[in-house]
Curated annotation (Swiss-Prot):
Signal peptide: none annotated. The active site is at D249. Keywords: ATP-binding, Magnesium, Manganese, Metal-binding, Nucleotide-binding, Nucleotidyltransferase, Transferase. This is Protein nucleotidyltransferase YdiU. Belongs to the SELO family. Its cofactor is Mg(2+); Mn(2+). It comes from Saccharophagus degradans (strain 2-40 / ATCC 43961 / DSM 17024). Mg(2+) binds at N250, D259. Nucleotidyltransferase involved in the post-translational modification of proteins. It can catalyze the addition of adenosine monophosphate (AMP) or uridine monophosphate (UMP) to a protein, resulting in modifications known as AMPylation and UMPylation. ATP binds at G88, G90, R91, K110, D122, G123, R173, R180, D259. GO terms for molecular function: AMPylase activity; ATP binding; magnesium ion binding. Its EC number is 2.7.7.-, 2.7.7.108.
Length: 490
């Protein structure tokens, strides 16, 4: 079945200024780790075909069918605020673009070996980082947040040196685009303005085709990216997601979450939470993500400056905050069960965040329990499950806030049971805590089995519904294991 996939390798047609043809370096003795059935459905292929010997060989670099056109894409980027003039795909290859019933998707092989852009790297990916990206794509899709996906993970017998010796692996990423803000920066800063325009025209054709050959199409591209980025980061903030490395080379031109490295979902609420322990100064802390999104868009606008009208570009960038705020407020009111705006809502929500921070409440658990809170039994329905029996005394102010909140919620002209049900569709039971991801990784490394990975992936795929025999993923880890910061090592 994989032999009959329809590829349209349009990026390859742009030429050698944009990417370099490279064949993947095969994994030694490849073995399948996992396959995501939802991504198979997205692509219109069977899970069995991916799991077959032929599929494992294709997605481990051991077999390159004629439909593939493996490319290492060139790009640059601002990393932690400093410009890096040439980055590019140092260990990943765009295998091709697959036409499906739901649109065109890139297939990208992470861990494909050295490329001209590897610099001092070995081009491999480790199993740990591939498992983390696999789970992240499933989790974000389950939450309804634009994201890349992972089709499968394959491990090999190759040993890779990071902080320790780890097994090599490949991950087949599926995304609507791998064009990054840094793709445009590369051509701008090298003064290759002809290629810059070619890339911009290509992006217009692929993602906003209604503007092809029209005046102002490049301003339309900037506005489109601004809008999609604002909505994406609003969604991150609403679920407590921290990306960790919001460099411009990790920002998708179409506003999908891309390049899952040292990410983390916030556990105990802390607006200044840092998930990447290499982020010494907190540039990419949770509360900085909205402003960094705008910073990155300004960098993109600078890269597009030879092609765009400055006043229109300024207007697009100035629209960012309003778009983000509107999207964030929409998501938060759904989490709170508010169907309409009322006077006093802003103060009520502000007090809520103060309580969350002061009591270090678990962000995901708080909102899920809030849907179940009952005015006539606040202690047992909300306070005790949230704080635990030993900490109820600390919840006096929280109980007062919850009573005020429930009074406000009752102003909605629908039955409370309906509101509770709706809140449960917007507040997940399960979130991808780094502690859980590490359990899956430990089992894979120590035992060579993947039962925790499979079970965790299943609950993350449908996070708003209770899963039998998965209660271990419903509650936060011990406090000393919460909010684990991880590194960029992968």
């Amino acid at each position: 079945m994989l032999e009959h996939l329809k590829f349209d390798n349009s990026f390859d047609k742009l030429g050698s200024d944009f990417a370099t043809r490279v064949n993947p370096r095969p994994l030694v003795n490849p073995k399948l780790v996992c396959v995501d059935s939802k991504t198979c459905e997205l692509l219109g292929i069977s899970k069995d075909s991916v799991s077959s010997e032929n599929g494992v060989n294709m997605f481990s670099g051991n077999r390159v069918p004629p439909q593939f056109a493996p490319l290492a894409m060139v790009y640059a980027g601002h990393q932690f605020g400093g410009y890096s003039s040439q980055l590019g795909d140092g260990r990943g290859l765009l295998l091709g673009e697959l036409n499906t019933h739901s649109g065109k998707y890139d297939l990208h092989l992470k861990g494909a070996g050295k490329t001209p852009y590897s610099r001092f790297g070995d081009g491999y990916a480790v199993l740990r980082s591939c498992i983390r990206e696999y789970l992240a794509g499933i989790a974000m899709r389950g939450l309804g947040i634009p994201t890349s996906h992972a089709l499968c993970v394959v491990r090999g017998d190759n040993a890779v040196t990071r902080e320790t010796i780890e097994p090599a692996a490949t991950l087949t990423r599926v995304a609507r685009s791998h064009i990054r803000f840094g793709s445009f920066e590369y051509f701008y800063y090298t003064q290759q303005h002809t290629q810059l325009e070619q890339l911009a025209d290509y992006a217009v054709e692929q993602y906003i085709p209604e503007y092809v050959d029209k005046d102002g199409r490049f301003n339309a591209l900037l506005h489109y990216t601004t809008e999609q980025t604002a909505k994406l980061i609003a969604a991150w903030q609403a679920v407590g997601f921290c990306h960790g490395v919001m460099n411009t080379d990790n920002m998708s031109i179409i506003g999908e979450t891309l390049d899952y490295g040292p990410y983390g979902f916030m556990e105990a609420y802390n607006p200044t939470h840092i998930c990447n322990h290499s982020d010494t100064y907190g540039r990419y802390a949770y509360d900085q993500q909205p402003s960094i999104g705008l910073w990155n868009l300004n960098a993109l606008a600078a890269a597009l400056s030879p092609l765009i009208d400055r006043d229109q570009a300024r207007a697009s960038l100035e629209s960012y905050e309003g778009i983000l705020t509107k999207e964030y407020n929409s998501r938060m009111t759904k989490k709170l069960g508010f169907l309409s705006a009322k006077q006093g809502d802003a103060k009520l929500i502000n007090t809520m965040f103060i309580q969350l921070e002061q009591l270090q409440l678990d962000y995901t658990l708080f909102f899920r329990l809030l849907a179940l809170a009952k005015a006539d039994d606040l202690q047992s329905s909300f306070i005790q499950p949230l704080l635990g029996c030993d900490n109820i005394a600390k919840g006096e102010q929280l109980a007062a806030w919850a009573a005020e909140y429930l009074t406000r919620r009752q102003l909605e002209d629908v039955p409370q049971a309906t509101i509770t049900a709706d809140m449960n569709h917007h507040n997940p039971i399960y979130c991808l805590r780094n502690y859980f991801a590490q359990q899956a990784i430990d089992e894979a490394y120590q035992q060579g089995t993947y039962s925790t990975l499979e079970k965790l992936a299943a609950v993350l795929a449908a996070p708003f519904t209770s899963h039998p025999n998965a209660s271990e993923f419903e509650t936060p880890p011990p406090s000393e294991l919460a909010n684990i910061a991880v590194s960029c090592s992968s």
